[in-house]
Amino acid sequence: MVKIADIEIGAFPLLLAPMEDVSDPPFRALCKENGADVVYTEFVSSEGLIRDAAKSKIKLDIYEKERPVGIQIFGANLDSMLKAVDIVEKTKPDIIDINFGCPVKKVVSKGAGAGILKDLDLMEKLTEAIVKRTKVPVTVKTRLGWDQNSIKIVEIAERLQDAGCKAIAIHGRTRTQMYKGDADWTYIEKVKNNPRMHIPVFANGDINTPEKAQQIKNLGLDGAMIGRASIGNPWFFNEVKYFLKTKNHLPPATISERVAMAKRHLEMAIGWKGERLGVYETRRHYANYFKGIPDFKPYRQKLVTSDEPKDVYSTLRKVLEEF
């Protein structure tokens, strides 16, 4: 049984990765219903939280049915990060996660996200201070290193563990790679095989088929953190679990299942943000829910341009009739 501190999360847990503009409460809840063992929020700016920015504060919303759920924060200023932790703690997450892996320029340029891979002393200092600040278990998501010449993930993992981190998720690329090339899980395996390590080590990056999840398990890693493969496909977690258990594949989601999922997503988004914003927020998911269906473009266009829930539901009914 894998544990994050005292939280039991299964023998080989599947975690939903924090993804900006994707991992909102409705999507997380759907992934949880479909096999995700732990879910993480979109990353939240520590500076935004302490400014009381609405865009940051709403990312702290969680449903009880999501638990265990982690709220991920990012930043490079110690005082701001500690104040952000105080704010986050009031929302009662099960886990607080620190983002030391985002490769995006606007984050990295401030020394946050993967930018901190250039300053491991600051990484350790921030982690240790956050762990001391909160009673909530602290985890970290990071990358192999800044570039191919500075891959220090074994050292990084040791230092994070020494600082009190309760689990680490590692994306198998460097910052300079962004999302190009293949994720290299062998470095993550080295972290797990380090006799000094005793906290869970999760692999992330390119785990987009059940077979690849099996490879992660075969490497002896504690679990898999799944990101892009789940977009438009919350069923992926159950597909992976079924394959790990039976070595067979579940049939792909039918049109009726896709329509039902899109409808539920919209309903939850409306319940979360109201009709106007709920309709708007769900638009970005339709292309992925109906990906690969021939001649779907006219229906997708209607779904992403409709402003009223009734119009979206009408289009979804037509999809059922036509396909």
Regions found by a protein language model. Give the residues of each.
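Aromatic- and acidic-residue-enriched carbohydrate-binding clefts of CAZyme catalytic domains
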Residues: L117
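Hydrophobic faces of well-ordered beta-strands that scaffold small-molecule active sites
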Residues: L14-A17, V39-T41, V69-I73, I96, ...
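Glycine-rich, positively charged N-terminal anion/phosphate-binding segment
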Residues: M1-A5, G10, M19-D94
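Alpha/beta catalytic cores of nucleotide-metabolism and tRNA/nucleoside-modifying enzymes
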Residues: M1-A5, G10, E20, P25-P26, ...
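N-terminal small/glycine-rich loop or linker at the start of catalytic domains
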Residues: V2-L15, E47-P68, C102, V108-K110, ...
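Active-site beta-loop-alpha junctions enriched in small/polar residues
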Residues: M19-D21, V44-S46, F74-A76, G101-P103, ...
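Alpha/beta enzyme core
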Residues: L82-A112, D121-I199
